[in-house]
């Protein structure tokens, strides 16, 4: 009996590093410009305003053998908004819209992942923007992963969703309906820790 228990314990101990390799922690590589948070919103129905948030941090866990256990956490410096027009940025960041003085940070914390096909799925989570937290669902796709030229290991993903600005107490009622929602797009590489 002792021999069987010892063998089972040694086998479990030997397999533990393999499990740890699979369920890896990654830091999003926003510092080296391998990650982007972008948005697109209609301008009066005539064209689009496209912008980015340039300053953010985040991490995620990813196990290709247990996709349901994937998790993501991202923090965004709202003041890093950039639409390539300084006066417009100032207005968007003002109390008229994002009120960055009162709400300097936005965040996303995942609550679940549901695979839907080869490298694709639905990521659910809580998005906090303008001091309001709402559940969202984001369509995501695994772009790829592997070793990088610097001795690290990376995984890359992209995702998108649509947000109703009124859900975050951002008053856009004086604008046409086409300006009351925006498309959010994220793409990032994570470096395994």
Q: What do the predicted segments below correspond to?
A:
Residues 1-22:
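Gram-negative bacterial Sec-dependent N-terminal signal peptides
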